């Protein structure tokens, strides 16, 4: 009888392990936190940048270096469209050095870069950007379709948003997308949503940030990505995710309301000034800047502060969230 009970208990724990652990296939990483007096984590976010220094990319990179030095940043996040116009042709494409290694040269930017893919990256050889060969060329480079990064009091959930966008499949125009390891699309999306939801629910971090390329709430030129509104936004809301960070629209933007997920766009890494703004509730639209720039985040256990900068390093917008009174 006792053996039967013990065996049943073991089976129960094994079942729980396989249900909650093995079904998530997202790669998990840990970034060690520096020992700072306030125990904080600092990083920069840049998107839509890779133009071999053109369209003010080099100027933005310089200001990133200046701010990165002041904040003593831990790492940099890239929200996609890393190489224009059509990603990389292969691991030996000179665009990697011309748009990345030779541009972000400031000492403060010699930190780990964590990157996701944008739609322009999918127009090239996706496997090249995911390859360890690039890491051998420049140790800072790390790019995956989707993954989880833990650093101190923050868990980051990087999500590949490109396959969600139906028109890339039904109306590709004259573009060719590299959908290797993505098809069948519906299964890929279903698995990703399952894994994201599972990983976010498992997280015990103080702060939970989701990072993707496409916007969920945006007044930018591209407008909202309805597929993400329908499929990803409910997961963010159910799990009380603090921030959704994206690029795609070539602007700097903050949309948010009291007590809910804040939506931060940092897509001003190079070409910008689209001159088109979608109508949006002014109570939610805290910042819309149709130009080049980037953002910084400084995180402690009690506060998440974020600042937007233009191409000259001028501060455009400051805001913060507090854990002591939920969201501000």
UniProtKB/Swiss-Prot annotation:
**Which sites bind substrate?**
248-250
Reactions catalysed: a phosphate monoester + H2O = an alcohol + phosphate
Q: Which GO terms describe its cellular component?
A: extracellular region
Gene3D superfamilies in alphabetical order? 3.60.21.10
| Cofactor note as given | Binds 1 Fe cation per subunit.
Taxonomically, the superkingdom here is Eukaryota
Q: Which CDD domains match?
A: MPP_ACP5
Which InterPro entries would you find in this protein's record?
Acid_PPase, Calcineurin-like_PHP_ApaH, Metallo-depent_PP-like, Metallophosphoesterase_PAP
- Which residues are Fe cation-binding? 48, 81, 84, 250
The UniProt record gives the binding positions of Zn(2+) as 81, 119, 213, 248
Q: What is said about its interaction partners and assembly?
A: Homodimer.
Q: What is this protein called?
A: Purple acid phosphatase 7
Instruction: Give the originating organism.
Output: Arabidopsis thaliana (Mouse-ear cress)
């Amino acid at each position: 009888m006792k053996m039967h009970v013990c065996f049943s208990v073991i089976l129960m724990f094994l079942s729980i392990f396989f249900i909650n652990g093995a079904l998530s296939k997202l790669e998990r990483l840990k970034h060690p936190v520096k020992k700072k007096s306030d125990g904080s984590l600092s990083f920069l976010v840049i998107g839509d940048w890779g133009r071999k220094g053109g369209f003010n990319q080099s100027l933005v990179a310089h200001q990133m270096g200046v701010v990165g030095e002041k904040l003593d940043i831990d790492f940099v996040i890239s929200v996609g469209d890393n190489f224009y116009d059509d990603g990389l042709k292969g691991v030996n494409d000179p665009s990697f050095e011309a748009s990345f290694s030779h541009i972000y040269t400031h000492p403060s930017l010699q930190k780990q870069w964590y990157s996701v893919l944008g739609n322009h990256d999918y127009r090239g050889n996706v496997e090249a950007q995911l390859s360890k060969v690039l890491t051998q060329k420049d140790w800072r480079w790390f790019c995956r379709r989707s993954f989880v990064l833990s650093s101190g009091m923050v868990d980051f959930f990087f999500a590949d948003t490109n396959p969600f966008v139906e028109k890339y499949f039904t109306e590709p125009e004259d573009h060719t997308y590299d959908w290797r390891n993505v098809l069948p699309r519906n299964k890929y999306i279903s698995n990703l949503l399952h894994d994201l939801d599972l990983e976010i629910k498992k997280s015990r971090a103080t702060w939970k940030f989701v990072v993707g390329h496409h916007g969920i709430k945006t007044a930018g030129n591209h407008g909202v990505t309805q597929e993400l509104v329908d499929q990803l936004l409910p997961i963010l809301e159910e799990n009380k995710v603090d921030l959704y960070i994206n690029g795609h629209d070539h602007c700097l933007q903050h949309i948010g309301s009291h007590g809910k997920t804040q939506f931060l766009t940092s897509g001003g890494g190079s070409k910008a000034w689209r001159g088109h703004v979608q109508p949006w509730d002014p109570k939610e639209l805290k910042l819309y800047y149709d130009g080049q720039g980037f953002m910084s985040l400084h995180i402690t256990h009690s506060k998440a502060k974020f600042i937007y900068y233009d191409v000259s390093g001028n501060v455009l917008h400051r805001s913060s969230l507090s854990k002591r009174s939920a969201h501000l």
